[in-house]
């Protein structure tokens, strides 16, 4: 009997060891907290609560630790007074608006060494200025603050700060110290809050800025106020300015923000109240770097109301999107715009004049009060959509060519005089020019370009380059000459076009390692991307695999290095190719086992200059060495087999350049970035970041079925079982 009893006790202990339990110190504080918030039974495992997410301390442990708290609505308003420091592994902390934090929480917040994120849906205390946030703390989201924000929030290493829905008592502190960490900032502004005019100076690395302006003049004791910025936002990519709607909106001038954002790529303005300072005359955004492709979006705003001529000019290739705004198209300079869309504009007017808009490729106007004709100039727009407006004139010939069914998809419904859904296609002006280029690339990325009149927008294997006048016909991968393709145009016309693939052209050689195997490579154009390639090296025919790469880069063909004929270092060898019946150039190369450059990236001044390049170059024969950047030759002024000095040309700022070092035909590439002249060229070590978006405005609950927690039998169950067995054997 004693043996059975001992075995039973052992079995119970063994089973208990196999179950997961929360860390005892965390269990005490969590049980008390959940009981006070939700009446949660203290005998239950806190990790099984929907508001708690736990994880095992490590892969072999049965002990769990609290990783995330998303505390939803409590039974009643509650102030957290418990000491939460036992939750040492907490990474995310979210509290409902009826749950309040105390200053003591922020006094020990630095003890949460893994804490990355806090979301509080109410803030009724000013965080102490001596608060020290954890080193890895990234995101602080505050809803409904009713107290002044502490300057420590703005001076801490937080990367993302989002503030929303302020209440009476909210204010923004004066910014004194520079904070290089903050990357994303969302900040509400009221008449009483104040606003720092040195944002760009205080946060030099800010990438996303959202300003929510409460401009409701109906509120008691509200008066006109304005906000401004001194300095340049050197790294700002996104700017969002939103105004609360009201019957009596306040008017703002935002020119100081829009005139100091040189690399912005997204501008969003919402709500009544934003205006352009009359003394400025025009918001000229053309200074913004065109490589950012700025997207301008305005919604339900008075920005362009009552303009007198042009008041907005964009950078090159920008897109302009308008929703529920009432303005004249004469307010906008279309010369730099690439895409234009306007939805629900109640201002009665004709379509925009696009004669001086050479970059415009897309026009989308929907449910707006545009009247009159569609001019012939709109036939060149690649992406055209004009339906559900009030156009009551005539359509151009390119639309007539398509008829009511296909053309109607672009411009109907509208009450035109000469066009409806039943209109038959009529296209006497359809014409294809005979003088097109008959040569195309073998990699399938190049199109056969044709020109003409009223060619339409698309068709099978057809894409518009300039709608109706210049189209590209997709040609598949292939090789050889005397090929043909038959295409059907949008108006139903069929035509056959003849073409040939470019002959092979050999540029250089190199080496490549794939899956542990080393290959000899030949670089060039006109290789076969479908089947093998016939290459002659020193009069010996060798079959290389089908080509790789292509597109913006040269093609690449490979052959196993251990099957290649043996060459002495710096010995000559000739290479030629026969692809699709077409012969390549014959080139003479010099063989080297290895050529390499030490630098991983080269950073150069955009004004041009001189730079050293280190590596192993295989020879002292300078006649075999050449250097180029994106095809432009550089002057080699000094050379040894381990170091060379070049004079390089000027270029626009950017990181899309490639330096090619060619030693006897062996080519090695190196990424090059051009920076503003005057800056010291150094390798870039700063990692790229992605602006965060505004977080959800509602608390989230952690599901209990995601594998992070497991249901456990309570200790009381085992004790009851043990007592029962003991009683049976006494």
Swiss-Prot record:
On whether Kinase is a keyword of this UniProt record, the answer is: no
Compartment(s) of residence: Cell membrane
Q: Name one GO biological process term.
A: pinocytosis
Residue numbers spanned by region Disordered: 678-711
Q: Which Gene3D superfamilies match?
A: Immunoglobulins, Ribonuclease Inhibitor
| Keyword list, A-Z | Cell membrane, Glycoprotein, GPI-anchor, Lipoprotein, Membrane, Repeat, Signal
Functional note:
Involved in the sexual cell fusion of D.discoideum.
The note filed under miscellaneous reads: gp138a expression is much higher than that of gp138b and may well be the major gene for gp138 product.
List the protein's name. Cell surface glycoprotein gp138A
Q: What species is this protein from?
A: Dictyostelium discoideum (Social amoeba)
């Amino acid at each position: 009997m004693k043996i059975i009893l001992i075995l039973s006790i052992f079995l119970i202990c063994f089973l208990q060891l196999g179950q997961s339990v929360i860390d005892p110190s965390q269990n005490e504080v969590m049980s008390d907290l959940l009981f006070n918030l939700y009446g949660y039974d203290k005998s239950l495992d806190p990790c099984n609560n929907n508001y708690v997410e736990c994880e095992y301390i490590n892969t072999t442990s049965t002990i769990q630790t609290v990783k995330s708290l998303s505390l939803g609505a409590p039974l009643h308003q509650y102030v957290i007074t418990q000491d939460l420091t036992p939750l040492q592994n907490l990474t995310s902390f979210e509290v409902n608006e009826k749950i309040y934090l105390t200053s003591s929480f922020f006094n020990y917040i630095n003890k949460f060494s893994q804490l990355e994120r806090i979301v509080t849906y109410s803030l009724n205390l000013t965080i102490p200025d001596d608060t020290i946030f954890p080193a890895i703390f990234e995101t602080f989201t505050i809803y409904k603050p009713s107290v002044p924000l502490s300057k420590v929030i703005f001076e801490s290493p937080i990367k993302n700060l989002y503030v929303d829905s302020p209440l009476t008592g909210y204010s923004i502190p004066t910014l004194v110290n520079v904070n290089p960490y903050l990357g994303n900032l969302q900040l509400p502004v009221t008449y009483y809050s104040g606003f720092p005019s040195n944002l760009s100076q205080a946060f030099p690395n800010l990438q996303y800025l959202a300003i929510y302006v409460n401009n409701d003049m109906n509120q008691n004791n509200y008066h006109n106020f304005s906000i401004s910025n001194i300095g340049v936002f050197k790294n700002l990519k996104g700017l969002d300015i939103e105004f609360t709607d009201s019957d009596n909106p306040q008017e703002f001038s935002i020119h100081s923000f829009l005139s100091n954002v040189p690399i912005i790529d997204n501008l969003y303005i919402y709500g009544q109240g934003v205006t352009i300072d009359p003394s400025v005359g025009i918001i000229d955004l053309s200074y913004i770097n065109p490589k950012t492709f700025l997207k301008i979006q305005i919604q339900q705003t008075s920005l362009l109301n009552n303009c007198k001529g042009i008041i907005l000019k964009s950078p090159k290739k920008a897109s302009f999107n308008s929703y529920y705004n009432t303005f004249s198209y004469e307010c906008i300079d279309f010369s730099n715009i690439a895409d234009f869309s306007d939805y629900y504009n109640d201002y009665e007017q004709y379509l925009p004049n696009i004669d001086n808009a050479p970059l415009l490729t897309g026009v989308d106007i929907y449910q707006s009060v545009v009247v009159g004709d569609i001019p012939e100039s709109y036939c060149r727009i690649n992406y055209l959509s004009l339906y559900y407006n009030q156009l009551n004139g005539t359509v151009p010939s390119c639309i007539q060519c398509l008829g009511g069914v296909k053309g109607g998809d672009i411009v109907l419904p509208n009450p035109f005089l000469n066009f409806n859904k039943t209109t038959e296609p009529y296209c006497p002006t359809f014409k294809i020019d005979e003088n097109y280029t008959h040569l195309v690339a073998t990699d399938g990325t190049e199109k056969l370009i044709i020109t003409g009149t009223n060619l339409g927008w698309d068709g099978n294997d057809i894409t518009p380059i300039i709608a109706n006048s210049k189209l590209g016909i997709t040609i598949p991968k292939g090789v050889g000459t005397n090929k043909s393709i038959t295409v059907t145009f949008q108006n139903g016309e069929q035509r056959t076009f003849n073409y040939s693939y470019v002959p092979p052209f050999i540029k250089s050689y190199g080496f490549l390692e794939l899956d542990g195997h080393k290959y000899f490579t030949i670089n060039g154009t006109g290789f076969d991307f479908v089947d093998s390639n016939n290459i002659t090296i020193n009069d010996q025919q060798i079959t290389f695999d089908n080509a790789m790469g292509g597109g913006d880069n040269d093609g690449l063909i490979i052959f196993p290095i251990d099957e290649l004929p043996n060459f002495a270092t710096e010995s000559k060898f000739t290479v030629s190719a026969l692809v699709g019946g077409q012969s390549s150039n014959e080139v003479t190369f010099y063989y080297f086992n290895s050529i390499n450059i030490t630098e991983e990236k080269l950073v150069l001044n955009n004004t041009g200059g001189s730079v050293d390049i280190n590596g192993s170059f295989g020879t002292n024969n300078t006649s075999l060495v050449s250097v180029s950047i994106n095809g432009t030759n550089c002057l080699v002024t000094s050379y040894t087999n381990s170091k060379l000095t070049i004079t390089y040309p000027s270029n626009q700022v950017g990181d899309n350049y490639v330096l090619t070092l060619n030693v006897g035909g062996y080519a090695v590439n190196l990424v090059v970035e051009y920076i503003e002249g005057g800056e010291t060229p150094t390798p870039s070590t700063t990692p790229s970041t992605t602006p965060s978006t505004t977080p959800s405005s509602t608390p989230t609950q952690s599901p209990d079925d995601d594998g992070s927690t497991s249901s456990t039998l309570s200790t009381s169950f085992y004790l009851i079982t043990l007592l029962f067995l003991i009683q049976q054997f006494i």
